[in-house]
């Protein structure tokens, strides 16, 4: 018991005296939580610059311009003349779209010649292009329906008849999840999961690889070295404990940014706990197998860096090649993000997250078993290197 207390004290001392570990594990999560929170705080993109070139300059064309200006998503940039090089003007003004109203627009409408309004979308940024496109379509669609209703009413139809004539059926579009299309609610929880996995892997990358370089490892773990599970637990304990502190930080930030919380807190913490264990065990495995701390870090970052992109959270898995889909299944972040989306964004029933819990559970066990085997082999190699018997036991602890 005395030796166990010494080992725990030793491990926490190593953790708190490692400045890199402290900055990564405590400063990085707070920094990214606030940075991403303030970045996406508005939730929606508004005031997207849109170039409007009105060649007609009539009451009807001006009405379209006014309607575009009334849309809070758009910020209209009025042009009387079309720029010589339109693409350069789009780049210079960072416009999300260009709306060109042709000459004789009003006259052709009154004569039923169906004039065309050209809308050019700047798809160099797909996100702003989609927001701009949706806003412009809504505005022009409203204007078109209103103009057609007026034309039918002039022919003697009442408002209801005119509406039925231009809209023979009604389609209702009902949003089920994230009804306000808030980008903060969609992205922030997922990015915090990415940050948590990243700091865990960075912390674990140096845990064993650095430990094996210390001559004190054999002496300090004398008597306990035969119990690889205990050695692993002692080395992981600080990360497990302080991961909970990071989760608490994320919780407080979510309250500030008004991000919805999971309805079943127990289910959330259970899945998050198994995610932390799975990510920790992955880090342990690589740290044991790769003796150099820098190389271990590089390998884990190769796994972790693209994890969010290939997780299926934004770009669906069914649109990826099969070999990438299979690779994503061995990264703890993938099932956790799926469960997180159900719990936070979709507010789904608890049973829908069960398969992701078991996915993480299996990953955790597989990485644990592989790490345990690797550690047993590594300890034997160290005893052989130092020409010591495995019955070696040094009880000189303070």
What are these regions (language model features)?
Residues 1, 5-9, 185, 224-237, ...:
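Alpha-helical membrane-protein architecture signal
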Residues 1-183, 352, 376-398:
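Extracytoplasmic/periplasmic domains immediately adjacent to an N-terminal transmembrane anchor
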Residues 57, 241, 245, 261-398:
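Membrane-spanning alpha-helical segments of multipass transporters and channels
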Residues 127-144, 177-188, 192, 210-222, ...:
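Hydrophobic alpha-helical transmembrane segments
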Residues 188-206:
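Long, hydrophobic alpha-helical segments
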Residues 200-232, 236, 380-381:
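Juxtamembrane interface at the cytosolic side of transmembrane helices
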Residues 215-220, 253-269:
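Membrane-interfacial helix-loop-helix connectors in multipass membrane proteins
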Residues 226-253, 357, 361, 365:
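Selective transmembrane-helix segments that form parts of the transport pathway or gating/packing helices
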């Amino acid at each position: 018991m005395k030796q166990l207390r010494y080992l725990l004290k030793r491990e926490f001392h190593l953790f708190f005296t490692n400045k890199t570990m402290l900055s990564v594990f405590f400063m990085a999560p707070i920094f990214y939580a606030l940075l991403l929170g303030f970045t996406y705080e508005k939730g929606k993109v508004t005031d997207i610059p849109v170039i409007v070139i009105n060649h007609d300059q009539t009451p009807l064309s001006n009405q379209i311009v006014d309607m575009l200006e009334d849309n809070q998503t758009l910020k209209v940039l009025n042009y009387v003349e079309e720029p010589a090089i339109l693409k350069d003007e789009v780049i210079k003004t960072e416009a999300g779209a260009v709306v060109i109203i042709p000459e004789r627009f009003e006259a052709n409408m009154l004569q039923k010649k169906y004039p065309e309004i050209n809308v050019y979308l700047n798809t160099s940024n797909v996100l702003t292009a989609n927001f701009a496109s949706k806003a412009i379509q809504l505005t022009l669609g409203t204007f078109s329906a209103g103009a057609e209703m007026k034309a039918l009413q002039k022919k003697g139809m009442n408002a209801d008849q005119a509406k039925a004539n231009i809209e023979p059926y009604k389609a209702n579009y009902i949003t089920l999840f994230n009804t306000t299309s808030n980008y903060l609610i969609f992205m922030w929880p997922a990015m915090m999961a990415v940050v948590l996995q990243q700091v865990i892997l960075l912390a674990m990358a140096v845990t064993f690889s650095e430990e094996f370089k210390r001559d004190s490892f054999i002496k300090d773990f004398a008597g306990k070295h035969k119990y690889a599970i205990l050695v692993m637990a002692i080395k992981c304990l600080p990360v497990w404990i302080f991961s909970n502190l990071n989760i608490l930080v994320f919780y407080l930030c979510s309250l500030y940014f008004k991000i919805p919380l999971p309805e079943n807190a127990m289910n959330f913490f259970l899945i998050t706990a198994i995610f932390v264990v799975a990510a920790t065990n992955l880090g342990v495995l690589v740290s044991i197998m790769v003796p150099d701390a820098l190389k271990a870090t590089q390998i884990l970052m190769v796994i972790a860096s693209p994890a969010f992109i290939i997780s299926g959270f934004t770009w669906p898995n069914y649109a990826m090649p099969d070999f990438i889909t299979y690779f994503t299944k061995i990264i703890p972040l993938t099932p956790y993000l799926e469960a997180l989306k159900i719990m936070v964004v979709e507010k789904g029933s608890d049973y829908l997250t069960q398969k992701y819990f078991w996915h993480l559970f299996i990953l955790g066990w597989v990485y644990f078993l592989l790490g345990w085997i690797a550690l047993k082999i590594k300890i034997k190699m160290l005893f052989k290197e130092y020409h010591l018997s495995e019955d070696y036991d040094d009880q000189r602890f303070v």
